[in-house]
Amino acid sequence: MKKYLFLFVAVVSLALSSGQAYAQRYLPKMMGVELRGGFVNGSKSPLNYNTGIAMSGYTKKANRWVVGAEYLLKNYDYRSTSIPRAQFTAEGGYYLKFLSDPTKTFFLSIGGSALAGYETVNWGDRLLHDGSTLLAKDAFIYGGAITLELESYITDRIVLLANVRERVLWGGSLGKFSTQFGLGVKFIIN
């Protein structure tokens, strides 16, 4: 028993004293699955939010590509109720890493994405509760997004994300621009 206890203490001591070894991060062909969420247009209301899932892959120069899907819900006040606008979009983009710390724990990236999807206003019901008719229609939407994202490695396989994103989408009846503030988590899968 003393032999195993000594071996355990020796291994833990070596592991804690070797503070100079850093994990290999942002290597080519690494893949990750991202879960994202956040607020829309600076609103802290739980009624205006976005959520999504994405797959990211790293390239040779520590940049990455991203492919994903996102759901965005924004409510517009109308008298004593609110009118929801929901967007379902697919994304394909590329992010450039432009800043990182020496320990490779924090990475700051800027990226551009192409977006396409569908927008529905009031879930397709154009007649409101008071008899008014909505002029906004459901439509296919397309456009792009610019994203500033901070990645913070918690472990070698778990990454916390914080981002600010500006989306511009044409084809819909309502505003074209949406600002998003979000958080997420990425799981490195290989």
Predicted regions, residues:
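Extended low-complexity acidic/polar segments
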Residues: 123-164, 187
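Short coil turns and loop connectors of transmembrane beta-barrels in diderm outer membranes
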Residues: 3, 25-29, 61-63, 100-106, ...
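Cleavable N-terminal export/targeting peptides
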Residues: 1-28, 190
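Extracellular loop and loop/strand-boundary signature of outer-membrane beta-barrel proteins
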Residues: 38-41, 76-83, 130-136, 168-172
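Predominantly the C-terminal beta-signal and adjacent terminal strand-loop region
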Residues: 72-74, 149-190
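Short glycine/proline- and aromatic-enriched beta-strand/turn motifs that initiate or cap beta-hairpins
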Residues: 21-74, 186-190
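Gram-negative (and chloroplast) outer-membrane scaffold detector with strong preference
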Residues: 54-129, 187-190
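Residues that define the transmembrane beta-barrel architecture of outer-membrane proteins
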Residues: 29-31, 45-51, 82-90, 106, ...
